[in-house]
C-alpha cells in the first residue's frame, strides 16, 4: 500500500490526541487508587465503552472479518458465544464485583480481592493469581505489539522493527503517564472510532456491489456454503466456538472496569450501552468479511492484497472505497482496537507487580506517590518485555491469544463467579479452582483427545473443584460471611 499524506496526517492527529488525553489524566492522578482504578469514578458511558474497547483487540477488525471472508458465515459462531458471555458477565458479575471489592478492604486488583474475600493469611492466592496475570498478560501484550506493528508495516511500508516501536510507543506513553483514567478515557474515544468504522464500511461495500440483494446473490453464486451456519462444523466445533464466551468471567482487564465504576447503580445503564456497542461492532465486523466476498468476486483485479492475507480485508476495503482522509480515520480504528487492549493489559500487569507483589511483600508502608511511580516503572518494564517477545514475528505470539483467553477464563472465571455469588466459598475452594482450571487448560491443550476448546473442560472442572473443596473444608468465618451478606444486600438494594 502506498503511503499517502492524508493517512499520515490522520494517524498522527489520532496518536497525538491519545497522548494528550494521557497528560490530561496525569493531572487528575493524585494517588495509587487513581492510577490503578481511576478513583472508582467512571460513569456509565465510560465504563461501558472502556470495557468493550479493552476487550476487542485488533482481532475485531482483522481476524474476525478475515475468517468470515475466507470461510463464510459459519465463522460467526464465535461472535455469538462472545455476545452471550459478555451479557452474562455484565448481568451476574459486574455489579456484585463492584460492591464486593469495596466491602473487602477496598480491593484494587483481582489478587487483592481474592486475598481479602477468602481471608487468605498465607497470601498464596495473591501470589498465584498475580503470577498467572503476569505470565498470560505479557504474552497478550506481545500479541498486541505484533498486531500494531503489522498495521504500521502494511499501511506505511515500514520495516518490521521500526513498525514495532512506532505501534507501541504512543500506547506506552499515555498508559505510563495517565494510568487508569488515561486508559479509560482513550478507550472511550477508541470505542467510538471502532463502531463508526464498523457501521460505515459494510454499508459502503453493499452500495458498491449494487445493493443487499445483489450482494447476497453474488455470495450465493460463488458458493452457497458461504451462507451455511454449519459449514464444516460438528457439535463439538460449535460448542468450542460458543465456549469463548466463558472467558469473560475471568479476564482481569475487563473486570477492572467493573471495579472502577462510580457505583453499582451505573452498571445497569453501562450494560445496555456496552452490549449495544458490542453487538453493532461484532455485526459490522461479520458484515465486512461477508459482503467483502461479494465485492472482490465482482472486482478480482483488486483482490491481490486479500488473496495474500484474508485478514487484510478491512484494510483493503478502506483503501479502495474511501478517499484517503476517510480511509485514514477508518484505519486508525484498527490502531484504536490494538491500543485500547494493549494499554489496559499493561496497566493490569503493572498493578499486579505494584499492589500485589511490591506493596504486598516488599514495601507494605510505601507512600502513595512511591506506588504511582513504581506502577509507571512496571508499565515500562512489561512493555519492553512484550516488545522483546514480539521482536521475532515468527514466534507465533498471536497464536497464543486463545491459550491466554482460556487460561484466564478457566483459572479466574469460576473463582470470580462463585466468589461474588456464593458466601460458602472458601480459600481452599478458590485455590483448588484456580489450580485445577489452569492445569486443565495446560493439559487439555497438550493431550486432549476431543477437539474441544480447552476453556470448556477447564471451566467445568474448576467449578467442581471449588464446590467440593469449599463444602468439605471449614466454613468461612462469621465475619467473612457478614461482609459478603452486607455487600449482597447493598447490591440488591436492601
Predicted regions and their residues:
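Membrane-embedded helix-loop-helix hairpins and adjacent transmembrane boundary segments
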Residues: 1-494
Amino acid at each position: 500500500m502506498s503511503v499517502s499524506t492524508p493517512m499520515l496526517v490522520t494517524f498522527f492527529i489520532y496518536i497525538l490526541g491519545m497522548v494528550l488525553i494521557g497528560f490530561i489524566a496525569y493531572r487528575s492522578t493524585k494517588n495509587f487508587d487513581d492510577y490503578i482504578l481511576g478513583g472508582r469514578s467512571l460513569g456509565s458511558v465510560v465504563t461501558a465503552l472502556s470495557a468493550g474497547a479493552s476487550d476487542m483487540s485488533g482481532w475485531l477488525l482483522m481476524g474476525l472479518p478475515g475468517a468470515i471472508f475466507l470461510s463464510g458465515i459459519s465463522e460467526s459462531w464465535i461472535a455469538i458465544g462472545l455476545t452471550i458471555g459478555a451479557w452474562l458477565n455484565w448481568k451476574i458479575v459486574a455489579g456484585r464485583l463492584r460492591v464486593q471489592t469495596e466491602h473487602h478492604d477496598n480491593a484494587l486488583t483481582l489478587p487483592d480481592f481474592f486475598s481479602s474475600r477468602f481471608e487468605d493469611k498465607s497470601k498464596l492466592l495473591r501470589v498465584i493469581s498475580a503470577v498467572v496475570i503476569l505470565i498470560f498478560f505479557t504474552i497478550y501484550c506481545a500479541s498486541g505489539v505484533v498486531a500494531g506493528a503489522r498495521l504500521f508495516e502494511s499501511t506505511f511500508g515500514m520495516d518490521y522493527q521500526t513498525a514495532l516501536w512506532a505501534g507501541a510507543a504512543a500506547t506506552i506513553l499515555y498508559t505510563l503517564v495517565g494510568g487508569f483514567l488515561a486508559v479509560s478515557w482513550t478507550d472511550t474515544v477508541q470505542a467510538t472510532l471502532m463502531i463508526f468504522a464498523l457501521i460505515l464500511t459494510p454499508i459502503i461495500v453493499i452500495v458498491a456491489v449494487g445493493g443487499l440483494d445483489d450482494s447476497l446473490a453474488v455470495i450465493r453464486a460463488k458458493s452457497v456454503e458461504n451462507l451455511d451456519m454449519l459449514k464444516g462444523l460438528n457439535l463439538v466445533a460449535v460448542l468450542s466456538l460458543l465456549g469463548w464466551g466463558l472467558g469473560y468471567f475471568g479476564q482481569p482487564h475487563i473486570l477492572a472496569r467493573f471495579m472502577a465504576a462510580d457505583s453499582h447503580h451505573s452498571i445497569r445503564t453501562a450494560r445496555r450501552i456496552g452490549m449495544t456497542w458490542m453487538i453493532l461492532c461484532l455485526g459490522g465486523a461479520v458484515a465486512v468479511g461477508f459482503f467483502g466476498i461479494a465485492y472482490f468476486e465482482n472486482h478480482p483485479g483488486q483482490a491481490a492484497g486479500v488473496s495474500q492475507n484474508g485478514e487484510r480485508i478491512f484494510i483493503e476495503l478502506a483503501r479502495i472505497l474511501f478517499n484517503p482522509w476517510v480511509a485514514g480515520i477508518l484505519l486508525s480504528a484498527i490502531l484504536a482496537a490494538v491500543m485500547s487492549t494493549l494499554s489496559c493489559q499493561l496497566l493490569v500487569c503493572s498493578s499486579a507487580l505494584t499492589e500485589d507483589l511490591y506493596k504486598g511483600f516488599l514495601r507494605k508502608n510505601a507512600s502513595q506517590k512511591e506506588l504511582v511511580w513504581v506502577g509507571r516503572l512496571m508499565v515500562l518494564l512489561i512493555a519492553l518485555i512484550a516488545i522483546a517477545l514480539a521482536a521475532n514475528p515468527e514466534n507465533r505470539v498471536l497464536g497464543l491469544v486463545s491459550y491466554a483467553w482460556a487460561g484466564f477464563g478457566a483459572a479466574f472465571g469460576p473463582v470470580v463467579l462463585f466468589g461474588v455469588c456464593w458466601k460458602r466459598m472458601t480459600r481452599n475452594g478458590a485455590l483448588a479452582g484456580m489450580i485445577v482450571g489452569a492445569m486443565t487448560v495446560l493439559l487439555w491443550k497438550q493431550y486432549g483427545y476431543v477437539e474441544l476448546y480447552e476453556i470448556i473442560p477447564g471451566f467445568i472442572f474448576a467449578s467442581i473443584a471449588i464446590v467440593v473443596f469449599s463444602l468439605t473444608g471449614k466454613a468461612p468465618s462469621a465475619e467473612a460471611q457478614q461482609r459478603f451478606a452486607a455487600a449482597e444486600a447493598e447490591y440488591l438494594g436492601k
